[in-house]
Amino acid sequence: MINKMTSRIAVSIAVVALVSGCASSGVAQKSEDPVAAKLDTYLLEDGAVRHEVTDKNVASLWQEYDALRRAGDLTAAKGKLQQAIAITPSDAALWSGAAEIELEENSHLRAENYAAKSNFLATVGNRPLRYRNWLIIQRAREGRGDLLGAREAEIESSKLQ
């Protein structure tokens, strides 16, 4: 169920990184996981993962990351994200992508830290990214057995809906 959840988180980054006002249509999928159900409203129909950047190197690395992540090669995908972060360390969406990979690899503390860093770097107006990060934090805390912390993260994410 965690892999299914993190796959949904991965797909939702498309909405997260888009400039506000871009049109997207949600894909409704039934899920037993309430966090995954919340993410469904942020999924694009085609499942595309997009991240708009101005640096050509970062854009290329993002595309490679996305292809590798979709192919299930998380180690190589993580490497591409690390390269992109080295070029643009203040890119909140890159840190969120890194958090997602760490979550999928069950590195819960690192996933939480990366998502928190992404929230710190995200603009106030980027509610979808901040919402996504709080869902990652919630899942990471659940994975560590920190149920009180997970509940706090759930409250924070609900403020952004």
Predicted regions and their residues:
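Bacterial Sec signal peptide processing site at the extreme N-terminus
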Residues: 16-42
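Alpha-helical segment of the N-proximal tetratricopeptide repeat
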Residues: 51-76
